[in-house]
Amino acid sequence: MASLGVNIDHIANIRQARRTVEPDPVPFAMLAELGGADGITVHLREDRRHIQDRDVQLLRQTVRSRLNLEMAATQEMVEIALAVEPDMVTLVPEKREEVTTEGGLDVAAQLSGLTPMVERLQQRGIPVSLFVDAETTQLEACRNSGAHWVELHTGTYADASWADQPGQLARITEGAATARHLGLRVNAGHGLTYQNVEPIAAIPGMEELNIGHTIVARAVAVGLQQAVREMKALIQNPRLDPLFGHALG
């Protein structure tokens, strides 16, 4: 059964839209945990467009579940991670012009630069996950980097038409199986919603789903604790679809 990591970046987005002090994402992380979140995820971007350094520092002190720090593979971010010591670091690609992360990290092309970063973090006892597309070449490179975890990019599945979703789901399912065969542990995330999460949650060996925007959007109507409860219920008990043999979207 997959666990739920709640990404609270979008709480910080609201704050930064007015360059003010509220809403503070730190107490919202506590509410997410009260709603059943198994972990809290934040992305400290190089441009600090939403989550700020003080958020990460305070979250490290207050999160009672697990703190997953998403960050670019840069020396600055590695130093921050070593100082904060989150429960996990997820290395992700970044482009300043993007609204949100647009694809997986090209580990195969960046292996020589990523490997020493992975090694340095893991030597300090910080598990490292690499956010990648479900491609064998990338997954093999992840294994070669020394990382023990991958987070499979689900954006293409989330953006696919109804007719194309089964094919995208099969690709991610095969990627998860390949990752496990390589000795990697598997998380997934990006673009998952209340409508499409169940098939991903039903993938064998899926350990954690990191979900943010849809939960924060739902929270506007029902509150964050209830929004988290609803998402966790879908992940824990995905319904089966008799047509495709996987969970209903």
Curated annotation (Swiss-Prot):
BP term (GO), one: pyridoxine biosynthetic process
Catalytic activity: 3-amino-2-oxopropyl phosphate + 1-deoxy-D-xylulose 5-phosphate = pyridoxine 5'-phosphate + phosphate + 2 H2O + H(+)
Annotated CDD domains: PNPsynthase
Entry binding sites for 3-amino-2-oxopropyl phosphate: N7, R18, G191, G212, H213
Record pathway: Cofactor biosynthesis; pyridoxine 5'-phosphate biosynthesis; pyridoxine 5'-phosphate from D-erythrose 4-phosphate: step 5/5
GO CC annotations, alphabetized: cytosol
Superkingdom field: Bacteria
Binding site for 1-deoxy-D-xylulose 5-phosphate: D9, H10, R45, H50, T100
InterPro entries according to UniProt: Aldolase_TIM, PyrdxlP_synth_PdxJ, Pyridoxine-5'_phos_synth
Alphabetized SUPFAM superfamilies for the sequence: Pyridoxine 5'-phosphate synthase (SSF63892)
GO MF annotation terms: pyridoxine 5'-phosphate synthase activity
Record localization: Cytoplasm
EC number in record: 2.6.99.2
Coiled coil: none
Active site as annotated: H43, E70, H190
Keywords: Cytoplasm, Pyridoxine biosynthesis, Transferase
Site (Transition state stabilizer): E151
Protein purpose: Catalyzes the complicated ring closure reaction between the two acyclic compounds 1-deoxy-D-xylulose-5-phosphate (DXP) and 3-amino-2-oxopropyl phosphate (1-amino-acetone-3-phosphate or AAP) to form pyridoxine 5'-phosphate (PNP) and inorganic phosphate.
Protein family: Belongs to the PNP synthase family.
Assembly and binders: Homooctamer; tetramer of dimers.
Protein name, per record: Pyridoxine 5'-phosphate synthase
Organism: Parasynechococcus marenigrum (strain WH8102)
